[in-house]
Design a protein with these regions (language model features):
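Enzyme catalytic cores with a strong preference for nitrogen-chemistry domains
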Residues: 1-166
Length: 166
């Protein structure tokens, strides 16, 4: 289903790409794989940015390897029109019981009760992503209703707020 999903977005993106140097925005879970891994799916997404001659903003899970564990994040990636990575935003304000389990450290047994629930790590802050000389404030899902997030992006010179959601 992963390649089929990318094929759908490829068709939609290439038929609607208005001109070079535009921005194409996909939803929160548009890339249902770890985009940061070098494989055929990553190449397919990069090719869409190149062939559309547009910047591409999309959601994909991501991870960071640490010595003794791996952290997972709900992320947005921004590709330049040449397919290179401009930046990544990791969602800061996570949804309880959907993206993390509250009080897990105090009550370890909760993890067994809610097996299968996401256990994402929160991002480090609201830092704009840059494409050319433009600064985008990216919000994922219900972060779009948080006025503090929008204010923080504005304080950091974001010119456009983009909310990706499913």
């Amino acid at each position: 289903y992963q390649l089929q999903t990318i094929d759908i977005y490829r068709t939609l993106s290439l038929q609607s790409a208005p001109s070079s140097n535009s921005l194409i925005v996909w939803p929160e879970t548009a890339a249902p794989f770890y985009f940061q891994q070098h494989n055929a799916m990553q190449s397919a997404v990069v090719d869409i940015a190149i062939n559309s001659r547009s910047a591409l903003l999309f959601g994909s899970p991501s991870y960071e390897r640490h010595r003794e564990y791996i952290s997972y994040m709900n992320s947005a990636f921004l590709l330049k029109p040449d397919g290179t990575l401009s930046g990544r935003y990791d969602k800061v304000h996570l949804v309880p019981y959907g993206e993390y389990v509250p009080l897990r450290s105090l009550f370890p047994f909760i993890g067994k009760l809610v097996a299968g629930v996401g256990d994402f790590k929160s991002g480090k802050g609201y830092y704009p992503l840059t494409i050319d000389e433009h600064h985008l404030g990216v919000l994922i899902c219900y972060e779009g209703i948080l006025p503090d997030a929008a204010r923080e992006y504005k304080r950091r010179n974001a010119e456009l707020l983009v909310n990706i959601t499913n």
